[in-house]
C-alpha cells in the first residue's frame, strides 16, 4: 500500500482521547475538527521540563528524495512508547511547496506516519496561511507608506529588503517589479517572493517564547532605510499589533496523533537549507512539559538543520539534547560512493565503502557539540546484510552504535531496538551540550567556525557584495547575532556536485541577508535561492480528488 492508503485506513482516536494520554483536559483543547486541536501556551511547565529527555533526529547528506528523518522520528516515538516511555513526536508542519513539488507528502512514511495525513499536508490548521498574511501585511504597509503624501516616513524604495512570501514553489516570482500601472497603483520598485518557510515571520514564530516576545521580535524586523540613511524597522510603521493578531492562533502548537495513536505535536516549518530548519520553541517546550521523551527533527543533514538547531534554537531557548539520532540509508551511502540514480537500489558494498565518509563526518559533527549519538540505518528491502554489517562496523570504530530501523514497514515494533539504544544514551548523562561558537565572536569568525568544523572547508571567501553588506550589518549592531547559513543540502560543501566527504575545498559567501527580528544573520553560500522552483514533472501532476472527496496521489 502507498503511504496515503495506509493513512486512509488508520484507526484514529478522537483528539480528546489522545489529549488524555498527556493529562490534557478537554477544556484546554481547541479542536479543529475531530482529529486536530490547538494547545494553549499555559501547558508549558518549566519544572516538568527538567525531568524530560530531548532527542534530536538528524541525518547524513541526503539524496533528493530524503532519507527518512520524519519517518524515523515518528517510528522512534512509537518504539519508545512500546518500551514503556511516554514519548511525543514534536515535528515541523509540511510546506505546500515540496508537497506539490519533488517530495510529495511530508508526514512520515509507511507505518510511521502522523495523521490525519491529508489534512496535515494540505493547509492543516492554517498556520502557514497566517504567517503568509502577517508577512504580506507588512509588505502592503511598506508600499502604502512609500506612496502616501501625508503619512510617509520617507522610506527609500531602493533600499527595501522585505519580500513578499507564498507557500508554493514558483521560480517566476523570485524577481518582480511592483507598483506598475500609474501613480494610483503605487511606486514602481523591484521586489520578489520567498517561500513561506523562509519568511522571517516563520523564523520569529519558531523562536518566540510567548506573545510579548513575538511582538518584540516583529518590531525588530529591518525593512530598509529612509532617504536620510536611517534604518526603518517594522515598529516604525505601527503595524506590529496587526501582524501579531494575525498570528493569534498560529502561535499555539497543534496536537495530532501517530498511526499507533501516540501524541504528536506539529508546529512551524522553516526549511533547513534556507532557514533554521526546526519546529517552534513553544512546541518543543510543551512536549517536554507533557511527556518523558520528546523526539524532534532538524531538516536535511547535520551540517544544516542540526547545526542551526544547536547553535540558534538551543542557545536562544536554553535547551540541550540528551541524545542525537543520525539517520543513514544504505541507498544514500551508495549515492555518496558514486552510484548513479538508477543504481541506488542495487547492493554494492564497494560504493558503500566509498560513501561511508559522509556518515563519519556527520557523526563527528554531532560530537563537536559534546553530544552522544546513535546511528539509525533506515532500512530498505534492497539493503544487503554485508552492507549493513559494514556500516555497523565503521560506526563501532567511531564509538557509536548503529541500529537498523524498520519503522516504515513495521511501525513501533520495528524500532524497539533503536528506542532502547536511544534511552541508554539519553539516560547515561554523557551528553554535555556546548554551542560551537560564542555569539560575541565576529560574524566572520562564526562563519569560519561552522565552515571549517562542520562542513570541513579549508577557507571562507567573500564576494565584494558580501563584504559591503557585512559592513552594514556591523554598523547596524547585528554582529553579535548567530549565523544561519544558507547552503545546498546536497553536499557538505557549497557545491552540490561534491559528494561523500570533500576535502581541500573553499566556500564563498555570495551575499548576506539578516533577520534582526528573528535574531540571526544569513550568509548565503553558492547559488542557493529562497524561493524554490518546481521540477519538470511536479508531484502535483499525480494528485486528484474524486466525487466522494477521496484524495489520491498524495504520498
Predicted regions: what is each one?
Residues 1-555:
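Flexible phosphate-sensing "switch/lid" loops adjacent to ATP/NTP-binding sites
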Amino acid at each position: 500500500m502507498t503511504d496515503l492508503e495506509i493513512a486512509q485506513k488508520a484507526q484514529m482516536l478522537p483528539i480528546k482521547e489522545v489529549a488524555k494520554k498527556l493529562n490534557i483536559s478537554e477544556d484546554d483543547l481547541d479542536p479543529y475538527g475531530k482529529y486536530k486541536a490547538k494547545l494553549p501556551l499555559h501547558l508549558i511547565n518549566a519544572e516538568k521540563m527538567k525531568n524530560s529527555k530531548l532527542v534530536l533526529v538528524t541525518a547524513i547528506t541526503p539524496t533528493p528524495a530524503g532519507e527518512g528523518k520524519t519517518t524515523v522520528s515518528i517510528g522512534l516515538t512509537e518504539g519508545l512508547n512500546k518500551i514503556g516511555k511516554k514519548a511525543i513526536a514534536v515535528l515541523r508542519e509540511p510546506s505546500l511547496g515540496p508537497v506539490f513539488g519533488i517530495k510529495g507528502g511530508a508526514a512520515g512514511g509507511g507505518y510511521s506516519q502522523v495523521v490525519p495525513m491529508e489534512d496535515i499536508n494540505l493547509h492543516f490548521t492554517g498556520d502557514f496561511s497566517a504567517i503568509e498574511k502577517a508577512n504580506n501585511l507588512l509588505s502592503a504597509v511598506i508600499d502604502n507608506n512609500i506612496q502616501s503624501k501625508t503619512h510617509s516616513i520617507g522610506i527609500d524604495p531602493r533600499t527595501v529588503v522585505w519580500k513578499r512570501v507564498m507557500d508554493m514553489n514558483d521560480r517566476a516570482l523570485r524577481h518582480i517589479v511592483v507598483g506598475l500601472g500609474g501613480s494610483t497603483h503605487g511606486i514602481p520598485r523591484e521586489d520578489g517572493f520567498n517561500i513561506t518557510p523562509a519568511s522571517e515571520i516563520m523564523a520569529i514564530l519558531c523562536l518566540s517564547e510567548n506573545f510579548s516576545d513575538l511582538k518584540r521580535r516583529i518590531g525588530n524586523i529591518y525593512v530598509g532605510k529612509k532617504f536620510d540613511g536611517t534604518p526603518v524597522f517594522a515598529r516604525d510603521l505601527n503595524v506590529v499589533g496587526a501582524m501579531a493578531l494575525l498570528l493569534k492562533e498560529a502561535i499555539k502548537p497543534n496536537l495530532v496523533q501517530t498511526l499507533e495513536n501516540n501524541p504528536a505535536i506539529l508546529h512551524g516549518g522553516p526549511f533547513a537549507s534556507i532557514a533554521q530548519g526546526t519546529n517552534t520553541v513553544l512546541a518543543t517546550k510543551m512536549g517536554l512539559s507533557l511527556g518523558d521523551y520528546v523526539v524532534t527533527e532538524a531538516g536535511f543533514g547535520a551540517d544544516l538543520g542540526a547545526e542551526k538547531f544547536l547553535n540558534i534554537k538551543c542557545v536562544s531557548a536554553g535547551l540541550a539534547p540528551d541524545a542525537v539520532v543520525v539517520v543513514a540509508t544504505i541507498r544514500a551511502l551508495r549515492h555518496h560512493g558514486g552510484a548513479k540514480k538508477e543504481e541506488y537500489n542495487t547492493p554494492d558494498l564497494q560504493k558503500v565503502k566509498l560513501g561511508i565518509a559522509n556518515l563519519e563526518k556527520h557523526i563527528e559533527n554531532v560530537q563537536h557539540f559534546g553530544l552522544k549519538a546513535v546511528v539509525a540505518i533506515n532500512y530498505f528491502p534492497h539493503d544487503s546484510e554485508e552492507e549493513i554489517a559494514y556500516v555497523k562496523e565503521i560506526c563501532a570504530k567511531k564509538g557509536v552504535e548503529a541500529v537498523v530501523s524498520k519503522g516504515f514497514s513495521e511501525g513501533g515494533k520495528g524500532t524497539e531496538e533503536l528506542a532502547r539504544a536511544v534511552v541508554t544514551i539519553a539516560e547515561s548523562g554523557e551528553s554535555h551540550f556546548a554551542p560551537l561558537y560564542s555569539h560575541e565572536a565576529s560574524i566572520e569568525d562564526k562563519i569560519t567556525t561552522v565552515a571549517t568544523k562542520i562542513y570541513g572547508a579549508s577557507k571562507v571567501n567573500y564576494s565584494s557584495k558580501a563584504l559591503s553588506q557585512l559592513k552594514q550589518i556591523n554598523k547596524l549592531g547585528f554582529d553579535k547575532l548567530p549565523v544561519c547559513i544558507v547552503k545546498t543540502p546536497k553536499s557538505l560543501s557549497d557545491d552540490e556536485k561534491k559528494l561523500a566527504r570533500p576535502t581541500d575545498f573553499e566556500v564563498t559567501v555570495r551575499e548576506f541577508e539578516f533577520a534582526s527580528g528573528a535574531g540571526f544573520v544569513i550568509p548565503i553560500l553558492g547559488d542557493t535561492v529562497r524561493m524554490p522552483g518546481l521540477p519538470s514533472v511536479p508531484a502535483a501532476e499525480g494528485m486528484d480528488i474524486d466525487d466522494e472527496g477521496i484524495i489520491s496521489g498524495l504520498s
